[in-house]
């Protein structure tokens, strides 16, 4: 098991691990009181070939794993197979069973997945196609259903060949979706329609950093950070949603090869 992504169930009983190199989805049992790992409850290796058998990236690569908001299913985003594999989650037995496949566009390389705060909409970021796919999520007759709503680009058409959509997050208030692109080194902010879940471009601008690998929004919903892997720094920006621009706040923070980050608001 060589994990690259984690997700924890709402009841703190299970931990999902996504394996990029081995294409494995692992379900770990947790002690909900101590927070320690009890053991491996279940695991599944993805199989198959993707875009081209001559390319290394065509093999299964699990980039992201998520519990659905209702905690009934597991979503495993596989960038090598251009799929999101869907598993039924048996909480009592600690087992996952394949139930369906959400097929993305050919050569899209899905990278990340997020759900809206109300659990009605899902967003899938595609690394090679440089787009966000929007879906309406619901459970029907005991099965998960994802209804495609929208595909929206993360970059200008002229930059497609040098752009790679790398990370995505949603602001704490659920009103905005953020994406960062490597190659063109930009941050893109979208407004989320609360009724339809669809996205509208608010701002697209450079971040003055190389190869952003992560983006996170602070609890005030205005400030956000990018982790710029190639020049060893974290940059903080302030977003102006009404005027459609953001500005850097202070000097970059030097951190060696930053890769991921979590923000936790402390209680006063």
Where do the language-model regions lie?
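Short coil/turn segments that connect the beta-strands within blades of beta-propeller domains
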Residues: 11-13, 70-72, 118-120, 173-175, ...
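Conserved beta-strand positions in repeat-built beta-propeller and related beta-rich domains
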Residues: 17-20, 68, 76-79, 116, ...
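Loop/turn-rich, solvent-exposed surfaces of beta-rich toroidal or solenoidal domains
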Residues: 163-196, 204-229
């Amino acid at each position: 098991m060589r994990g690259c992504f984690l997700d924890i169930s709402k009841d703190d009983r299970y931990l999902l691990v996504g394996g990029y190199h081995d294409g494995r989805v692992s379900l770990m049992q947790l002690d909900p009181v101590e927070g320690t790992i009890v053991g491996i409850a279940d695991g599944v290796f993805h199989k198959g070939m993707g875009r081209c058998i001559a390319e290394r990236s065509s093999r299964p690569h699990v980039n992201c794993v998520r519990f659905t908001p209702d905690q009934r299913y597991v979503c495993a985003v596989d960038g090598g197979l251009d799929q999101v594999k869907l598993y039924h989650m048996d909480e009592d037995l600690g087992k996952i069973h394949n139930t369906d496949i959400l097929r993305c566009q050919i050569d899209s390389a899905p990278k990340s997945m997020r759900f809206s705060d109300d659990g009605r909409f899902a967003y899938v970021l595609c690394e090679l196609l440089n787009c966000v796919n929007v879906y309406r999520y619901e459970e029907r007759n005991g099965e998960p259903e994802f209804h495609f709503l929208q595909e929206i680009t993360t970059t200008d058409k002229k930059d497609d060949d040098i752009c790679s959509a790398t990370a995505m997050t949603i602001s704490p208030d659920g009103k905005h979706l953020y994406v960062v692109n490597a190659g063109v080194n930009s941050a893109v902010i979208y407004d989320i329609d609360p009724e339809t879940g669809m996205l509208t471009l608010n701002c697209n601008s450079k971040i003055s950093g190389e190869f952003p690998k992560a983006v996170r929004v602070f609890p005030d919903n205005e400030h956000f950070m990018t982790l710029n892997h190639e020049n060893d720094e974290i940059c903080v920006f302030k977003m102006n949603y009404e005027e459609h621009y953001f500005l850097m706040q202070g000097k970059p923070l030097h951190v060696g090869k930053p890769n991921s980050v979590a923000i936790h608001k402390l209680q006063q």
